[in-house]
Amino acid sequence: MAIKDWPEGEAPREKLLSQGVKQLSDAELLAVLLRVGLKGLSAVELARIMINEFGGLRSLLNASQAQVCRLDGIGPVKFAQMQAAVELGARISQENLKRGKILSDPDLTRDYLMRQLSDRAYEVFAILLLDSQHRVIQFVELFRGTINSASVYPREVVSLVLEKKAAAVIVCHNHPSGIAEPSTADRRITERLKQALQTIDVSLLDHMVVGDREIVSFAERGWID
């Protein structure tokens, strides 16, 4: 059945307007962007096929034009609509953590880091530099590759902190496996960084590990004391 033939209030766009965007499933949200499906497939059914084909919404939205347009019914226009939606979300996230923004909402930080790091195919170790009022100075990617206790150099972190005159920092890195659970090596790195930063009287507020669907906070687990 085509979406236009659905009972009033059940079609994704009408459901969004009447119940709010958060009430829509991933497939329904994507269907709003797609607008139409294929012969014999509604936009929601097409969206569900697309999500399943890529193993999830995030993988679909991070796929290349060539990969996405191999799917029946998906051409450059639909791909462009999807990319525009992704970029709008990314820009809103960046605006929320722009320079001078006071970092008072943990959810904003999580959303920003998820957008920055969750789709990387390799490990990235980064640092969010803050002033004494916990206002954002800069987000910097420091190390790439296999992140372990031997590849993260505290002296480089300290050097950057001094250069930017930061008073506090949040460090973060991603797990390309998609599993955010910190490793023993992650905990060792954190302790080394904490000790190094203490020598220059800078606070390590948190170490966040980014997976596909979640972020694990060392501070929330009581590991930054």
From Swiss-Prot:
Zn(2+) binds at H173, H175, D186. GO terms for biological process: proteolysis. A motif (JAMM motif) lies at residues 173-186. CDD domains: MPN_DUF2466. It comes from the Bacteria. Keywords: Hydrolase, Metal-binding, Metalloprotease, Protease, Zinc. Residues 102-224 form the MPN domain. GO terms for molecular function: metal ion binding; metallopeptidase activity. Pfam families: RadC (PF04002), UPF0758_N (PF20582). PANTHER family: DNA REPAIR PROTEIN RADC, UPF0758 PROTEIN YEES-RELATED. Belongs to the UPF0758 family. This is UPF0758 protein Spea_3837. It comes from Shewanella pealeana (strain ATCC 700345 / ANG-SQ1).
